[in-house]
């Protein structure tokens, strides 16, 4: 027996990726809507209400507009920022403590933001395990492929009219007033007393993400060994998250941000300096995989009582 699934917003980057993943799965029946119907919130709601599960791959306002029209028992996965800090919604990161069970029993799941996924994968266990205090002054830097900017940015970077040498050849930092839209979920889901200082950087490659979080071990009141042991134990049963050993030799003496492009896995790297008082914790993944459509499909599998990693790469 097939499961009826509808993707509201199937023409965007995330929606297209989800549709491609589900099209090859015989147990999934993808529902459709006319071009005219996509512009009618009541028509969209009608199709969603006929589904077993729906993905909302929409701007925040469009997601908020349709939600009051939906049956409470329809399973909904929202990929916007609209509901990620809403207490009525469950956060779609199954590897966090207790989160898998919540997602399995939920009708409302908010898919994490890409940068937020990387930061939370590090900060949440540090705070939860008492390896850093809730008021620790966290900071992080995130590097992303240009697909994270959606269709408009993809078109800019891949334009046939792009000059041989242009400013977008170089990495671009942005959000420099420290107000990125992922910050509320980064703080709340990690359990922090203060908003972290976060700077994102977009780079000239299609997909892949690296989030780097420095840790002052004296200020945190812990040791590198305790951090490595704690994080490894935290994710030991994680379906898509793995942890490398402390100071494991890095491939090519560093990490390329696009190393996991095309994958739905997340890999955490932990390094410590010679003095043993500073660490760098790095989350490596694909912004379109664990940072977006891969996480959404993983949550769908759990909500529909399917194999958690079915359809993942």
Map each language-model feature to its residues.
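PAPS/PAP-binding and catalytic site of the sulfotransferase fold
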Residues: 109, 227-230, 296
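Short, hydrophobic/amphipathic alpha-helical packing segments
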Residues: 116-123, 179, 293, 297
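C-terminal helical cap and adjacent loop that interface with cofactors, partners, or active-site loops
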Residues: 257-313
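Active-site catalytic microenvironments for nucleophilic, acid-base chemistry
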Residues: 125-129, 216, 299-306
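Residue-level signal for short, function-critical loop segments
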Residues: 114, 219, 287
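C-terminal substrate-binding/catalytic lobe of Rossmann-fold NAD(P)-dependent oxidoreductases
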Residues: 11-45, 137, 141-142, 146-281
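N-terminal Rossmann-like NAD(P) cofactor-binding subdomain of oxidoreductases
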Residues: 1-174, 272-274, 310-312
């Amino acid at each position: 027996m097939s499961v009826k699934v509808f993707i509201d917003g199937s023409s965007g980057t995330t929606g297209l990726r989800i549709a491609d993943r589900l099209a090859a799965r015989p147990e999934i029946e993808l529902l459709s809507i006319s071009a005219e119907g996509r512009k009618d919130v009541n028509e969209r709601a009608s199709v969603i209400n006929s589904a077993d599960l729906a993905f909302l791959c929409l701007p925040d306002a469009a997601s908020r507009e349709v939600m009051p029209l939906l049956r409470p028992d329809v399973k909904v996965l929202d990929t916007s920022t609209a509901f990620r800090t809403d207490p009525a919604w469950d956060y779609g990161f199954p590897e966090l403590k207790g989160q898998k069970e919540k997602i399995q029993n939920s009708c409302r799941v908010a898919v994490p933001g890409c940068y937020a996924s990387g930061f939370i994968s590090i900060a949440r266990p540090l705070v939860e395990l008492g390896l850093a205090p809730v008021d620790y002054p966290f900071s992080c830097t995130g590097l992303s492929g240009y697909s994270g900017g959606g269709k408009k940015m993809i078109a800019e970077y891949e334009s046939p009219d792009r000059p041989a040498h242009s400013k977008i050849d170089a990495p671009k930092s942005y959000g420099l007033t420290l107000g990125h839209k992922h910050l509320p979920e980064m703080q709340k889901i990690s359990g922090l007393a203060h908003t972290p200082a976060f700077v994102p950087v977009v780079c000239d490659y299609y997909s892949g993400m690296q989030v780097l979080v420095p840790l002052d071990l004296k200020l945190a009141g812990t040791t590198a060994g305790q951090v490595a042991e704690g994080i490894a134990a935290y994710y030991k049963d994680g379906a898509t998250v793995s942890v490398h050993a402390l100071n494991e030799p890095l491939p090519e003496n560093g990490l390329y941000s696009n190393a996991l492009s095309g994958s739905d896995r997340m890999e955490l790297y932990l390094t410590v300096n010679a003095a043993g008082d500073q660490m760098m914790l790095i989350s490596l993944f694909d912004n379109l995989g664990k940072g977006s459509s891969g996480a959404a499909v993983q949550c769908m599998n759990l909500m529909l009582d399917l194999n958690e990693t079915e359809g993942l790469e």
